[in-house]
Swiss-Prot record:
The gene is thiG. This is Thiazole synthase. Homotetramer. Forms heterodimers with either ThiH or ThiS. It holds the Pfam family ThiG. The keyword Cytoplasm applies. GO terms for cellular component: cytoplasm. It is found in: Cytoplasm.
């Protein structure tokens, strides 16, 4: 069970809505993933009508919607987008994204912290997408963010946990949930994130661009479950030396 702010989730896999070939395929993949929290970019939906091709099936599926501010380049733009989302969707939950560079889509740490502090004061449950910077994540936690979402690698790159060393520090020092966001390309990346202590992962591109998104979504669901179970089982310590699983002495005498 994962708790973030005022909500609890059985699934530790969050999903996105971009890059799918159709809305129907998107919904089928989300259902296969078991995800209960789904992000959507405000710039991609028509907020004037709930029969929007992306929004309507998500509402029907009964998942928790997490609007994001993707496309915002400044704190001011992100705050404005957040206010529109709250008014249109009736939710105070928000994934805060501010990335001014369209090529790398790396989050702006200064603008993100600035916007996060303002949005928390306005009553939003803020989940900020940020770099894998332990100091920044701690500052975001201190201003009231309900979770932190450090990247594993650039958005959509499928590179995996390239920031593993920093993610481990973030996880170790965090007192709010840590959701590894961006860069996760295959289910084993998700397993690794859960094994190392992350509370959840957010996956979009890896599922949406697969030849079979529904099958890939299922694979990610199982991978996240495996990673969580492995962590709860408490793996044995790593060792430089070998440690025999069978006795090396006495077996000849026993056979005599």
């Amino acid at each position: 069970m994962l708790r973030i702010a005022d909500k609890t989730f059985d699934s530790h896999l969050f999903t996105g809505t971009g890059k799918f070939a159709s809305s129907q395929l998107m919904v089928e993949a989300i259902r296969a993933s078991g995800s209960q929290l789904v992000t959507l970019a405000m710039k991609r939906v028509d907020l004037r009508q709930h029969n929007d091709a992306i929004l309507a099936p998500l509402i029907e599926a009964g998942v928790t919607l997490l609007p994001n501010t993707s496309g915002a380049k400044t704190a001011e733009e992100a705050i404005f987008a957040a206010q529109l989302a709250r008014e249109a969707l009736g939710t105070h939950w928000l994934k805060l994204e501010i990335h001014p560079d369209a090529r790398w889509l790396l989050p702006d740490p200064i603008e993100t912290l600035k916007a996060a502090e303002a949005l928390v004061k306005q009553g939003f449950v803020v989940l900020p997408y940020c770099g894998a910077d332990p100091v920044l994540c701690k500052r975001l936690e201190e201003v009231g963010c309900a979770a932190v979402m450090p990247l594993g690698a650039p958005i959509g790159s499928n590179q995996g946990l390239e920031t593993k060393a920093m993610l481990e520090i973030i996880i170790q020092q965090a007192t709010v949930p840590v959701v590894v966001d961006a860069g996760i390309g295959v289910p084993s990346h998700a397993t690794q994130a859960l094994e190392m202590g992350a509370d959840a992962v957010l996956v979009n591109t890896a599922i949406a661009v697969a030849d079979n998104p529904v099958m890939m979504a299922t694979a990610f669901r199982l991978a996240v479950e495996a990673g969580l179970l492995a962590r709860q089982a408490v793996p044995g310590n790593r060792s430089t030396y070998a440690s025999a699983t069978s006795p090396l002495t006495g077996f000849l005498e026993a056979l005599a």
